[in-house]
A protein has these predicted regions:
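Generic detector of contiguous secondary-structure segments
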Residues: 47-56, 352-359
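Transmembrane beta-strand segments of Gram-negative outer membrane beta-barrel proteins
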Residues: 23-39, 57-74
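Asp/Glu-centered strand-loop micro-motifs enriched in Gly/Pro and often flanked by an aromatic residue
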Residues: 38-40, 45, 84-89
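Hydrophobic h-region of N-terminal signal peptides that target proteins for export
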Residues: 11-19
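Outer-membrane beta-barrel pore proteins
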Residues: 40-42, 49-62, 101-107
Length: 410
């Protein structure tokens, strides 16, 4: 049991990072968020640095775009097969942000430059200390930040390309109970904390076919997040300290490549529709390895098979200009899970998701635009088994994410 519990702790780390960076919540731009998370074909503002670097040189002027969001997730658990035991994750709010600055070097320039600093995901989950799955997880906290300097070149009025270098860094903190008790009856605990970093790139092509039709193609590379000196801390009875020494660990956690294609169509002077399709190369995430600086009979280097499968997400959105100052937006998305049966666990349980979004943009002045958006994520209830611990349950996950931001044109 003790060996399996430690294995589950390590496995949970991989679940955290895969959920954090690869699970396509698409919070990197508020206008795009409001339209189902798509933005490959239409460079709405400076956040095209993330969605399609090729659109940067097509912006009319230099822009600054900043936004803050508030993720409020909830997970419901029912134990299988009877469902007699249920639990809910504790209420929490997480605060990802995005900042972009960029545009053409000068009016009429073919070259565009920009910088994006964005959080592809920052969230977590906390269960009650005495819940039935405490030997798998008690709490999770994840923060991640990507920094992307970007350059774009506009060949003509129809075709532009762009490329960005990505430096990614983040932190994680995971705690769980251990099935060991001291003389007072208090259970032991384990905590894994670490900082990770990695590098990648973002490529994009923007095609302005005519006054009504636009296309976009992007490729974001795989990023290997490397933890070189994570901390593993154990609280156990004194007699067992030699079996559970506080130590360091290293690992490499791959975040998958994403290829996207998008189309935008201006139906009339007021209405624009857009469609995005995202291919996520999860199959590259086939295994995970942990190396510890100290080893005991209970603490050894481990290698985990993952068996993720590739997914294709679809995003549909609309922008309607009520007048010159006010725009309304809405969208839908379907985002399937890459996690195979036998690997569904309460760290961050994963299932196919349906997404509804909406938003409003108000042009306060000719230069300043205020944007508010919201996303509701509803996951299909999933019966899952975590084979490592033979832990079974039905999971139902929802999340509400409002956000507010500003865009300023120079």
């Amino acid at each position: 049991m003790m060996k399996k519990t430690l294995l589950s702790l390590l496995f949970a780390v991989s679940c955290i990072w895969s959920y954090g960076a690869g699970y396509q919540l698409n919070l990197q731009g508020l206008r795009q968020l409001a339209m189902g998370g798509g933005g490959t074909a239409v460079p709405w503002d400076a956040s095209t640095i993330f969605y399609n670097p090729g659109g940067l040189s097509s912006l009319g002027s230099w822009q600054i775009n900043a936004s803050a969001l508030f993720i409020m997730p909830n997970v419901e658990y029912a134990q299988l097969p009877t469902g007699s035991y249920t639990a809910n994750s504790n209420a929490q709010t997480f605060y990802p942000f995005n900042f972009y600055a960029g545009g053409p070097l000068k009016k009429g320039s073919k070259w565009g430059l920009g910088l994006g600093v964005y959080t592809p995901f920052g969230s977590g989950l906390k269960w009650d200390d005495n819940w039935t799955g405490r030997f798998l997880v008690r709490s999770i906290n994840l923060q991640s930040i990507f920094v992307q300097p970007t350059v774009s070149y506009k060949f003509n009025d129809h075709i532009s390309v762009g490329a960005g270098y990505i430096y990614a860094f983040g932190s994680l903190d995971l705690t769980q109970a251990l099935p060991l008790q001291d003389l007072t009856g208090a259970e032991g605990s384990a905590e894994l904390k670490g900082n990770a970093s990695g590098m990648g790139f973002n490529l994009g092509v923007h095609i302005n076919a005519n006054d009504k039709l636009q296309f976009g193609f992007t490729y974001r590379s795989r990023v290997d997040m490397k933890i070189s000196s994570g901390n593993a801390t154990f609280v156990v009875p004194t007699s067992l300290l030699s079996n559970f020494p506080n130590t360091n660990f290293s690992s490499k956690l791959p975040l998958p490549e994403v290829a996207s294609v998008g189309v935008g169509y201006k139906v009339n002077e007021k209405l624009t529709l857009q469609l995005d399709v995202n291919f996520v190369g999860w199959s590259a995430y086939d295994s995970l390895k942990f190396d510890f600086t100290q080893h005991t009979s209970n603490l050894k280097d481990e290698h985990f098979p993952r068996f993720y499968h590739n997914t294709v997400a679809v995003r549909l959105g609309a922008n309607y200009d009520v007048n010159k100052k006010l725009s309304l937006m809405g969208g839908l998305a379907y985002d399937p899970s890459p996690v195979s049966d036998g690997y569904v666990s309460p760290e961050l349980p994963d299932a196919d998701r349906y997404v509804i979004t909406c938003g409003i943009a108000y042009r306060a002045t000719s230069k300043l635009c205020i944007i508010a958006a919201a996303e509701f994520v509803n996951s299909i209830a999933r019966d899952g088994t975590y084979d490592v611990m033979n832990f079974k349950g039905t999971y139902k996950t929802t999340a509400f994410t409002p956000g507010i931001g500003l865009s300023y044109n120079f």
